[in-house]
């Protein structure tokens, strides 16, 4: 059987989340236009299909301004632009997406644009909304934006928004709404994803849990008459030998103060959500070296909220792990490593040439 195709994305550390030693700030790795642009350019040069531009409020760069600027610097790679639901009036969000897509330009085939959207539904500063209403609002926003960017007249009467509008004059290159990538583990998050997103993103977990989550999300989407694609967000440490990879992982934590790591985790607006709690559970279930299953190392979660584990091993081991996820239904990977520019080069050298990959077509 031929190897299935998948999308391989990297991560640009816009939120002051780049280190040589986890938890130890380095002025040369702090988020700046030059540094984060360099990560994007290295990812494009290395052959990655897509790159996540994350969103944060307390640290780093503004995602929208960065995306618009870096869109003029790249020629092939897609951008996965993160945006938080509720920070924009939905029709304005639709216009912003269309504008970014136009700046970024067409894909290699000339069949559409190169922008994807990472939908985030966390609380915002000064705002606390219960999970149910917050995800219901996100669902409404995605439906509104999709209708407008598909070039259709909008007549929407929801709980949060009541709108009658024609689509914006400026549309996307394809004339359709870009793909929505969305993640969340709670019941409300899963229902939101099933009803309105395109790619359901998972953070690191055991293979059994990945299999269980995919089955659950397929069933939920079917209840809405829809199908989902599946993505996996994970860090990676790849070296020529397993000993070298494990030694590098240990080195990342060699200067970490546990209190400093805790402070970093608690700064995040999503520090108390279901997904973060699950990452904590994985660390608690790991062995003495931090591995919760073969080649899945949870040490990174000691110094960051959110995605808290890494695939650690040789090129063959990393490739085997990715293929195992593919066999369960994962079609898109969002990878990262510390420091991000260096580790993009490592993955591009050792693993990427051996993967049948390309942009996810939705």
Curated annotation (Swiss-Prot):
GO terms for biological process: alkanesulfonate catabolic process. The keyword Zinc does not apply. It is an enzyme of class 1 (oxidoreductase). Its EC number is 1.14.14.181. InterPro entries: Luciferase-like_dom, Luciferase-like_sf, SsuD_RutA_monooxygenase. Transmembrane segments: none annotated. The keyword Mitochondrion does not apply. It comes from the Bacteria. Keywords: Carbohydrate metabolism, Flavoprotein, FMN, Monooxygenase, Oxidoreductase. One of its GO terms (molecular function) is alkanesulfonate monooxygenase activity. It catalyses: 6-sulfo-D-quinovose + FMNH2 + O2 = 6-dehydro-D-glucose + FMN + sulfite + H2O + 2 H(+). Belongs to the SsuD family. Part of the alkanesulfonate monooxygenase (sulfo-ASMO) pathway, a D-sulfoquinovose degradation pathway that enables the complete utilization of all carbons within sulfoquinovose (SQ) with concomitant production of inorganic sulfite. Catalyzes the oxidative desulfurization of sulfoquinovose to sulfite and 6-dehydro-D-glucose. This is Sulfoquinovose monooxygenase. The lineage of its organism: Bacteria, Pseudomonadati, Pseudomonadota, Alphaproteobacteria, Sphingomonadales.
